[in-house]
Amino acid sequence: MAVGVFDSGLGGLTVLDAVQRRLPEVPFVYFGDNAHAPYGVRDADDIFALTCAATERLWAEGCDLVILACNTASAAALKRMQESWIPRDKRVLGVFVPLIEALTERQWGDNSPPREVAVKHVALFATPATVASRAFQRELAFRAIGVDVEAQPCGGVVDAIEQGDEILAEALVRSHVEALKRRMPHPQAAILGCTHYPLMEATFQEALGPEVTVYSQANLVAESLADYLARRPEFVGQGTESKFLTTGDPRSVSNKATQFLRRRITFEAA
């Protein structure tokens, strides 16, 4: 039994860390497509092709259920994958769903009409590709009415985090928050719509101010996955061991990942 976790780089490790803590008995196979990162500047067809290739690799590892722990892939590829590509005995889940459930306080299976929610002004921080897809706004509109979403494409942040340049990453986050607040001075909530961003959560919160509720994905996804597997245990796949795979240089990626999570992580070539 194993569950696959995919990201274009290292950001998905924030999700992996949370799901491992929540489900310690489940083996997880992590696949980082570091050779092609970042996805946030690629076009939708490119993202679709790369995401399908990574998903197939995780299926080959015995993971019948794959989590796209990458907002760009979830936004630009998942809908198309679910409509035309995923076989009936497999499942691929994105990371938007738990966020929208938390924001709208309604479950995913709730198909009642959209309704008013408490939060009216939402700031979305994400990669340029995620912002361009408008996937978050589309999914939110199915569930809530009267919510104003202001999206800020956060160019450069993922690269700075992947390169371990914390000072640059912090400066970029502050600059992106300032840019958004010029358009939406008083957001009630902020969505960190990239799995790299939880590492910068304190900086986002500080720049936004204490009155803004910041939604970060890792723990929300972990709770959602635990709930899903309780309802659908047949999708815990045949794999039996946890491992870390990368399309990049395993040694370099292992070193960065170890810095990233502050515990030893060893990647092998995918």
Swiss-Prot record:
> Which residues does substrate bind?
7-8, 39-40, 71-72, 195-196
Q: Listed GO molecular functions?
A: glutamate racemase activity
Q: In its UniProt record, which GO terms are filed under biological process?
A: cell wall organization; peptidoglycan biosynthetic process; regulation of cell shape
Keyword check for Isomerase = yes
Please name the Gene3D superfamilies in this protein's record.
Answer: 3.40.50.1860
Please name the pathway: Cell wall biogenesis; peptidoglycan biosynthesis
Q: Which UniProt keywords apply?
A: Cell shape, Cell wall biogenesis/degradation, Isomerase, Peptidoglycan synthesis
Active site positions: 70 (proton donor/acceptor), 194 (proton donor/acceptor)
Record field: catalytic activity? L-glutamate = D-glutamate
Q: Report which superkingdom the organism of origin falls in.
A: Bacteria
EC supergroup of this enzyme: isomerase
Give the EC number(s) listed in the UniProt record.
5.1.1.3
Q: What does this protein do?
A: Provides the (R)-glutamate required for cell wall biosynthesis.
Stated family: Belongs to the aspartate/glutamate racemases family.
PANTHER family, per this entry? Answer: GLUTAMATE RACEMASE
This protein's name: Glutamate racemase
Organism listed in the record: Cereibacter sphaeroides (strain ATCC 17025 / ATH 2.4.3) (Rhodobacter sphaeroides)
* Gene this chain is encoded by: murI
